[in-house]
């Protein structure tokens, strides 16, 4: 069926049933198999299968490996639900379960405190985007009385621009959280505490790409909100530039690749911001394979070490010990660098060309920012390869004696290497296929034939020249890289410190004050705690009142009818007063 949809361009919508009906609002659930969903399902299926085969050997000695395989399979199932759903509510179910299962995968090694903190950070930051997604769905139900894509696409041209901007803004923020764009990107780096197969799956074709997919699926709405497209364009531009600068100075291999993912997702957002949705999906399609291969190659290197360290400064000289991992990482890195002839070249460079082809001020600025980001990509890709394989060996003889490669892990890596090298040659089929179902306001065909050759070659020339400069710096003038700017980006632009000081600490203080004045204050007196204590002490109060009445009555009788009016009556009144004070100032009497 998938091949029929792919080649004959006939979408299939399968109605499975009615979920609920309230008044004139009826929400169904079903599947939509069109060109967009099929293009995403191809990398999801291939990468998931490759990761599962890879994980069989990677997790061989883990006592909880069966649980890992189950969670990984459930993750792929809900990613499929997200992709083939025919309405926003069903899509949100897949979106939400993907986030929950990613929490379980990141915290799989739950004996590590860093893994648990990272998983908590991931799910809390994604809650911000999920909240806006829910509000957007509620707005659709209130305004359109429908959430299926077909109805929304038909009604969008007749909708108020303010309402469309509001919904587009909420979808953009949801995608910003899920796809780790600047401002809500903190969870992506800490998510590297999970097993490497998790990183290969979630940061290649599944979780982080779901935000891009939702925006492309909502392209019929975004085309009527040019202001939101402009915001998306500038947000993506800053994201791809800052992530590249942070990756250049990072020493953790997996975090460099996570920042690379963040940069490439921003490239996809740049394409969407310039209304080139087909190019965004084509880059997602190609990026999934070589990024999964990069993570698998990194996992093979770490798995070969006894300590499984991720610090590239402790590697070096591995080209003779891990020749297959070197070959796969080199091919994936060259594809990421957009080397001519490889997959990344066909999907990445055309996005930068389409930015210039918009012929607007923002388009020109974003073209140069994207070119700078592509140059940084070449620099940190070559840096990873150099420090790992070409540098002077940094480990001891005992470590190198146990370095080895796994033949079981090599098979899925070989398959992804083929895709990373030759998938770009299917460019025409994929891009023209995508244009059939997506808006094509910015046509790459016009850009291809009108752009000067200099702007096509500029990213390649800058990438090669500055990469060679990086090698020179590491070989001869390494101290040049030690500066305050280096430290600034090595600390990830102090994002964690700013978040803690400006958001987390004030929120925690506000929460503590709220707890003191409500939970331990008002609710303790007027709430269930105060009422229960009052009910418990009612019998005590009744007995005290009865005792008080009896004593007053007895005193009155004795004072006026028994004791004569002498000094004894005065002495009796003094003793009686002291006795009453002692009775009514006991701790039991003071409980209310």
UniProtKB/Swiss-Prot annotation:
Keywords in alphabetical order: Electron transport, Membrane, Mitochondrion, Mitochondrion inner membrane, NAD, Respiratory chain, Translocase, Transmembrane, Transmembrane helix, Transport, Ubiquinone
GO MF term list: NADH dehydrogenase (ubiquinone) activity
Major place of residence: mitochondrion
GO cellular component: mitochondrial inner membrane
Compartments it resides in: Mitochondrion inner membrane
Transmembrane segments: 36-56, 68-88, 89-109, 132-152, 169-189, 196-216, 229-249, 256-276, 279-299, 322-342, 364-386, 406-426, 451-471, 534-554
Gene Ontology annotations of biological process type: ATP synthesis coupled electron transport; electron transport coupled proton transport
Annotated catalysed reactions: a ubiquinone + NADH + 5 H(+)(in) = a ubiquinol + NAD(+) + 4 H(+)(out)
Family designation: Belongs to the complex I subunit 5 family.
Descriptive protein name: NADH-ubiquinone oxidoreductase chain 5
Gene symbol of the encoding locus: ND5
């Amino acid at each position: 069926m998938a091949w029929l949809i792919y080649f004959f361009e006939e979408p299939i919508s399968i109605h499975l049933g009615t979920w609920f009906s309230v008044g004139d609002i009826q929400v169904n659930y079903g599947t939509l198999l069109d060109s967009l969903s099929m293009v995403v399902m191809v990398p999801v299926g291939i990468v998931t299968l490759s990761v599962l085969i890879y994980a069989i050997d990677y997790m061989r000695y883990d006592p909880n490996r069966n649980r890992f395989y189950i969670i990984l399979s459930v993750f792929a199932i809900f990613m499929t639900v997200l992709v083939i759903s025919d309405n926003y509510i069903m899509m949100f179910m897949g979106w939400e379960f993907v986030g929950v299962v990613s929490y379980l995968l990141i915290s799989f090694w739950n004996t590590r405190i860093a893994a648990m903190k990272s998983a908590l950070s991931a799910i809390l930051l994604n809650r911000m985007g999920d909240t806006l997604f829910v509000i957007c769905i509620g707005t659709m139900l209130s305004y359109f009385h429908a959430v299926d894509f077909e109805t929304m696409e038909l009604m969008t041209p007749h909708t108020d621009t303010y309402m469309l901007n509001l919904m587009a803004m909420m979808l953009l923020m949801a995608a910003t959280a899920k796809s780790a764009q600047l401002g809500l990107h903190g969870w992506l780096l800490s998510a590297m505490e999970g097993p490497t197969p998790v990183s290969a799956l979630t940061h290649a074709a599944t979780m982080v790409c779901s935000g891009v997919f939702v925006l492309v699926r909502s392209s019929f709405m975004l085309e009527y909100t040019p202001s939101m497209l402009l915001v998306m364009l500038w947000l993506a531009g800053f994201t791809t530039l800052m992530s590249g600068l942070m990756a250049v100075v990072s020493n953790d291999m997996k975090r460099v690749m996570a920042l690379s993912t963040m940069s490439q997702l921003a490239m996809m957002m740049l394409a969407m911001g310039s209304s080139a949705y087909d190019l965004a999906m084509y880059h997602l399609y190609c990026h999934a394979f070589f990024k999964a291969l990069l993570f698998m190659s990194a996992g093979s290197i770490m798995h070969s070490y006894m300590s499984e360290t991720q610090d590239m400064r402790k590697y070096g000289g591995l080209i003779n010990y891990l020749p297959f991992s070197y070959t796969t990482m080199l091919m994936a890195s060259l594809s990421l660098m957009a080397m001519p002839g490889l997959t990344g070249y066909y999907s990445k460079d055309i996005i930068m060309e389409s930015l210039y082809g918009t012929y607007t001020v923002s388009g020109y600025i974003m073209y140069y920012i994207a070119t700078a980001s592509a140059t940084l990509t070449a620099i940190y890709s070559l840096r990873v390869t150099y420090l790992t394989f070409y540098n002077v060996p940094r480990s001891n003889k005992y470590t190198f004696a146990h370095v080895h490669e796994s033949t079981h892990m090599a098979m899925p890596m070989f398959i992804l290497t083929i895709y990373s090298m030759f998938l770009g040659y299917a460019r025409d089929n994929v891009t023209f296929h995508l244009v059939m179902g997506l808006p094509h306001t910015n046509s790459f065909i016009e850009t291809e034939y009108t752009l000067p050759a200099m702007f096509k070659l500029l990213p390649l020339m800058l990438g090669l020249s500055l990469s060679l400069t990086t090698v020179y710096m590491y070989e001869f003038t390494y101290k040049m890289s030690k500066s305050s700017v280096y430290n600034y980006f090595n600390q990830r632009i102090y994002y964690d410190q700013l978040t803690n000081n400006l958001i987390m600490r004030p929120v925690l203080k506000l929460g503590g004050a709220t707890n003191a004045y409500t939970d331990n204050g008002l609710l303790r007196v007027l709430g269930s705690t105060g009422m229960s204590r009052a009910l418990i002490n009612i019998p005590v109060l009744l007995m005290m009142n009865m005792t008080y009445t009896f004593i007053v009555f007895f005193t009155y009788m004795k004072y006026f009818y028994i004791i004569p009016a002498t000094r004894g009556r005065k002495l009796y009144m003094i003793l009686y007063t002291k006795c009453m004070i002692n009775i009514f100032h006991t701790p039991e009497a003071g409980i209310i």
